[in-house]
């Protein structure tokens, strides 16, 4: 077995997450075969009515500039069937911190790499938000050998089929230490079984393998795969009814430009008046967590999801006013400091960033109670109430102007500094 050790240490006085040593391993083929024969997927279902959609499907492709995706044969055709989010931004480089930031956590803790990580169990995730309303969730990872597989990749050699660093919730001990949660991380065979048997969850994250997502091929290949994957699903009423389907990318392929990524929404929950149009509202990966919280009345994690803009029609329905962001000086291509840094592209620092605990946040439902309890009395490390992440200490995304005009005519504005 191949082993790599990485120690995550904490600042002594603020040990709010348990330090531990993580082990990157490749189970033997015999161990994998045994697990395949015994570990069964877990497919909970729920029917919690949302404000504007009842199911959310998130599909990620890899490493492509906006213009390159827009020039493909199939992706613009699909986008015209729904709503193109013209101003949607990834939040850093490389890939793994975007996966971590977007779905489970709302932060990266300094992650500037695609390493093997295990994040302590008292760090809250989006799964904890869903649990407050008993909303069923699931991940579908193409090439995963069995539900809840925790190895770094599969197979160990050859083409990159499944890789751990594209599997957001497997990074968290609060998921891997829970047998039911772990079995909700499944493969594509389980996806089609769940589809056929009408037991899809209300939230799902879908990761193609490294060939189909374009990482080891190109955008033409991944665009063709997307067309083949989605075309049949879009004809399935069970899949599309009251469903919002997002197709997006983890990051741009060019690191020196702004991290604006090609993103569009499909499905029966896209408002009729928005079909075939473009939305120029400023969004980030964090906007997804914030919009899910708004849709289902969930609290915030108190991190960068707190101040993120909401999907425009959701904001209109709730009365929240999104910020306009001047992106002329915005790049979103660097990671803030933290304990998961390799000290290469961000600064390693042993202390874990403290979330905000007293903000109402854009979703309007306050902060998750366990987050408030864990960090009670501490001051937030960053200004998590802004519509994009920035850090004065490292100089990331500073000097960016943002503003909004409230319904009473009052103008609120600021500059990240």
Swiss-Prot record:
The keyword Hydrolase applies. Gene3D superfamilies: Alkaline Phosphatase, subunit A. Keywords: Glycoprotein, Hydrolase, Secreted, Signal. Residues 1-19 form the signal peptide. One of its GO terms (cellular component) is extracellular region. The keyword Methyltransferase does not apply. The N-terminus is blocked. InterPro entries: Alkaline_phosphatase_core_sf (IPR017850), Phosphoesterase (IPR007312). It catalyses: a phosphate monoester + H2O = an alcohol + phosphate. The active site is at residue 216. It comes from the Eukaryota. Its EC number is 3.1.3.2. This is Acid phosphatase. It comes from Aspergillus niger. The lineage of its organism: Eukaryota, Fungi, Dikarya, Ascomycota, Pezizomycotina.
